[in-house]
Amino acid sequence: MEAALRKLISAALLAASVLVLSAAGFAQAPPAPDPEKPYVMEYYYKTHWGHQEEFLDLFKKNHYPVLQTEIAAGRILSVRMDTPAYHMPEQERWDYRVTIVFKNAQAAFTPIDEHAIQLKLFPDQATFKREEQHRFEILEAHWDLAMSQIALDKK
């Protein structure tokens, strides 16, 4: 009886494993980015409570000018920042979402000399570095999402 039960459990575990692995094969991969189309990245920032405005001020002072330089160079098409209109549960909370639309995927992933841009924009590097370090110290979490658009009208 015990041997039969073990065989039954083993068979059930094997069947469950096969189903799980088969289902993973059916999961649809995101579409590959079109090299000719704009590429969207979203950056989420969650600050420590009470530091939302301070983070926003430092972002606008020290990081947004770098992004504007990249817009002027044609690498980035647009930059937008959003904040939730209502509160969320703490675990899911984020304070700011920055959406950057790059010219294309290559522009998004080709490294640039951001340090050269920062040197040109911020001659007082000691202050700039201190403020940027503080901007990240007041963050509780930060994550990036590459977005893939799905054409709903295609079959």
Features from the language model and the residues they span:
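An amphipathic, aromatic/His-enriched active-site/gating alpha helix that lines ligand/cofactor pockets
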Residues: 30-34, 65, 69-77, 91-93, ...
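N-terminal secretory signal peptides that target proteins for export/translocation
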Residues: 1-7
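Bacterial N-terminal signal peptides
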Residues: 11-22
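Short amphipathic alpha-helical/adjacent loop interface patches that line ligand
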Residues: 5, 12, 59, 63
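Acidic/histidine-rich, surface-exposed loop or edge segments in extracytoplasmic proteins
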Residues: 35-50
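Sec/Tat signal peptide C-region and signal peptidase I cleavage site
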Residues: 23-27
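N-terminal, post-signal-peptide region of Sec/Tat-exported proteins
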Residues: 48-91
